[in-house]
A protein has these predicted regions:
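Acidic, Gly/Ser/Thr-rich repeat motifs that build Ca2+-stabilized beta-propeller blades
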Residues: 1-62, 104-120, 163-167
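Beta-propeller domain segments
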Residues: 57-167
Length: 167
């Protein structure tokens, strides 16, 4: 992934390597809001062969709850950049939403997706770095909740750091 300045729009591209040179740039996905912080930017092929991409909220927390925005999400696309028919939102690369700044993810031995996320360290005394079990179409709550909540619209983290930060 990389960002194009001055627009701060992130994108994921594929290149062909020939004689130690990059050529044949192919954009898999673009128009991902970016900023100086909270860019996410992890990419990983899942056990289903799909490409997963974490995006931060681009220091605009409300984008995490906007299903039309690609910020504050985990995205899922085919290796050619098209959107899988099985994605939870029709014609959308959004796989899960309500993320602040997911820093990494992987799948356990049972093919369950697990993601780490930076909490809002220093902001109003909240920290709550999180470990989340990612499920398709689910809302992980940022910025409406931090840590655990009784609000059934949101998925609670599997684990969070409380009022301290791990990272």
């Amino acid at each position: 992934t990389y960002v194009e300045l001055p627009s701060h729009q992130n994108k994921v591209v594929r290149f062909t390597v020939s004689n130690d040179n990059l050529k044949d740039e192919f954009v898999l996905i673009d128009n991902i809001p970016g900023a100086l912080w909270h860019d996410g930017g992890r990419i990983h092929f899942g056990p289903d062969g799909m490409l997963y991409i974490s995006t931060g909220d681009a220091i605009n927390p409300s984008l995490s709850q906007d299903i039309k925005s690609l910020a504050g999400k985990i995205l899922r696309i085919n290796s050619d950049g098209t959107i899988p028919d099985e994605n939870p939102f029709e014609n959308s690369p959004v796989f899960s939403y309500g993320h602040r700044n997911s820093q990494g993810f992987d799948w356990n031995s049972e093919n369950i997706m697990v993601a780490s996320e930076h909490g809002p360290s220093g902001e109003k005394g909240r920290a709550h770095d999180e470990i989340n079990i990612i499920k398709p179409g689910q809302n992980y709550g940022w910025p409406e909740i931090v840590g655990d909540s009784d609000d059934l619209r949101f998925i609670n983290p599997a684990l969070h750091s409380g009022d301290v930060t791990w990272a």
